[in-house]
Structures are given as structure tokens and as C-alpha cells.
Amino acid sequence: MAVTKLVLVRHGESQWNNENRFTGWYDVDLSDKGRTEAKAAGQLLKKEGFTFDFAYTSVLKRAIHTLWNILDEVDQVWLPVEKSWRLNERHYGALQGLDKAETANKYGDEQVKQWRRGFAVTPPELDRADERFPGHDPRYASLTAEQLPTTESLALTIDRVLPYWNESILPRMKSGEKVIIAAHGNSLRALVKYLDNMSEEEILELNIPTGVPLVYEFDENFKPIKHYYLGDADEIAAKAAAVANQGKAK
């Protein structure tokens, strides 16, 4: 049976992950730890014999630089790369830039958990006059007013990720190309929910660690057979737990 593999990687730790702030579409870079994580991901992929034909990432530098570091480690910096806003992190609305723990102290752990992980829950909306609104950013100049978010739930994130999966990524895989996607916690959760047919309750508890390759294997009909992380299982579990704890009051 022919098996097709897809590699998903959440970007390495960003500067705002390190500061425990809501990031969303704000374009922060990797922290030093994040760059180390990205390089380690590339080294793991090289050790396991992975090579690629095409790469996808978002238009945010923390994902782009993660991909650069991975491709450098697997000696494929020449690889064609497609960047799309559809792979961006979920837009966190007016929460962007706020400290997660301070927000939890103010609104409570459960409210912040719903804002961070709830399927259909949207954070407080961003005013379109706010400098954080993506309509002020030239990289989004080609988007329509309806496509520019002022806030997003995971459900809305899925609505923009899945068309891109079906129209661009999956056809490339079906043509035989080996694909890697470097993206974000919630754009990848959106894809994982679809691939694994997860319920809204199940996706609430899913936390994707930074900088760890997640491998999906598909059968000849491009149905997922299994998935697994590369690396030490205990370390990966600890990193996922740390992601879950970011939104709790101190």
C-alpha cells in the first residue's frame, strides 16, 4: 500500500510566546529558544530521512523563519515555498498583545480557555480603526473587506484553512509531491480537527507544541492512517502541557 506523508510544524517559540502574550496576526519573530527549536526540528527530520518537494507557510515571520531553519538543516533551502494568509494564526481580536495570565486574572481561567480553545467562541472584536487591524498592513492589500478579520474563532479559522487545503495543498500531495507545512497553533489545530474528524469537545483539549514535527500518513485514497510526533515523547508531552497552562491565572 502506497503511503503519503505530510509534515506539520508549529513555529518555534516566539518572543510573545516567551512573554505569554496573545499574538494572533501580530508579526513577532522567534525567540532564541524558538530558533533552537526550529533547527532541532530540521535535524530530527534529516535524521529520519525526510526530504520535501514543496513547502507551505503563513505570511508571519515566526512561521517563515521556522521553515527557513528547517530547510537549512535538511539542506533544502532552494525548495519552492508558498506563503498564504490562510495559514496565519487565528486572529485574537482585541486580546492581541495582552498578557494571558493577567487576562485570566481579570476574566477568569475558564473564559480565557474558551477564548483560546473554544470552537465557536470569538475573543472581543478589534476596531477597524485600531492600528492592529490587518487592513492597515500592506501584505493583506489583496484581501477583501470580508476576508480581513477583526476577531476569529477556531470555526472561522477552519473556514479559511480548509479551502486552501482542498484547493492547493491536497492536490499537490495527490500529484506525488512531498509537502511540509510550517504554520501556527490554531491554523494547524484547524487542519488536525478536519483530518482526524475531531469533535468540538476534543479539539478544545488539543495543544500543539512549538517546533515539533507532526507526521501524518495517508492511504492511497488520501485518508489519514496515523499520525505521530518526532522526538522524545516525555519532552513533547511537557511542551504541550506548557502550552495549555499559558492561559491560566497566576
Swiss-Prot record:
<dbReference type="InterPro" id="IPR005952">
    <property type="entry name" value="Phosphogly_mut1"/>
</dbReference>
<feature type="active site" description="Proton donor/acceptor">
    <location>
        <position position="89"/>
    </location>
</feature>
<comment type="similarity">
    <text>Belongs to the phosphoglycerate mutase family. BPG-dependent PGAM subfamily.</text>
</comment>
<feature type="binding site">
    <location>
        <begin position="116"/>
        <end position="117"/>
    </location>
    <ligand>
        <name>substrate</name>
    </ligand>
</feature>
<feature type="active site" description="Tele-phosphohistidine intermediate">
    <location>
        <position position="11"/>
    </location>
</feature>
<feature type="binding site">
    <location>
        <begin position="10"/>
        <end position="17"/>
    </location>
    <ligand>
        <name>substrate</name>
    </ligand>
</feature>
<feature type="site" description="Transition state stabilizer">
    <location>
        <position position="184"/>
    </location>
</feature>
<dbReference type="GO" id="GO:0006096">
    <property type="term" value="P:glycolytic process"/>
</dbReference>
<comment type="subunit">
    <text>Homodimer.</text>
</comment>
<keyword id="KW-0312">Gluconeogenesis</keyword>
<keyword id="KW-0413">Isomerase</keyword>
<feature type="binding site">
    <location>
        <begin position="185"/>
        <end position="186"/>
    </location>
    <ligand>
        <name>substrate</name>
    </ligand>
</feature>
<dbReference type="InterPro" id="IPR029033">
    <property type="entry name" value="His_PPase_superfam"/>
</dbReference>
<feature type="binding site">
    <location>
        <position position="62"/>
    </location>
    <ligand>
        <name>substrate</name>
    </ligand>
</feature>
<dbReference type="InterPro" id="IPR013078">
    <property type="entry name" value="His_Pase_superF_clade-1"/>
</dbReference>
<dbReference type="GO" id="GO:0006094">
    <property type="term" value="P:gluconeogenesis"/>
</dbReference>
<comment type="pathway">
    <text>Carbohydrate degradation; glycolysis; pyruvate from D-glyceraldehyde 3-phosphate: step 3/5.</text>
</comment>
<feature type="binding site">
    <location>
        <begin position="89"/>
        <end position="92"/>
    </location>
    <ligand>
        <name>substrate</name>
    </ligand>
</feature>
<dbReference type="Pfam" id="PF00300">
    <property type="entry name" value="His_Phos_1"/>
</dbReference>
<keyword id="KW-0324">Glycolysis</keyword>
<dbReference type="GO" id="GO:0004619">
    <property type="term" value="F:phosphoglycerate mutase activity"/>
</dbReference>
<dbReference type="InterPro" id="IPR001345">
    <property type="entry name" value="PG/BPGM_mutase_AS"/>
</dbReference>
<feature type="binding site">
    <location>
        <begin position="23"/>
        <end position="24"/>
    </location>
    <ligand>
        <name>substrate</name>
    </ligand>
</feature>
<protein>
    <recommendedName>
        <fullName>2,3-bisphosphoglycerate-dependent phosphoglycerate mutase</fullName>
        <ecNumber>5.4.2.11</ecNumber>
    </recommendedName>
</protein>
<feature type="binding site">
    <location>
        <position position="100"/>
    </location>
    <ligand>
        <name>substrate</name>
    </ligand>
</feature>
<comment type="function">
    <text>Catalyzes the interconversion of 2-phosphoglycerate and 3-phosphoglycerate.</text>
</comment>
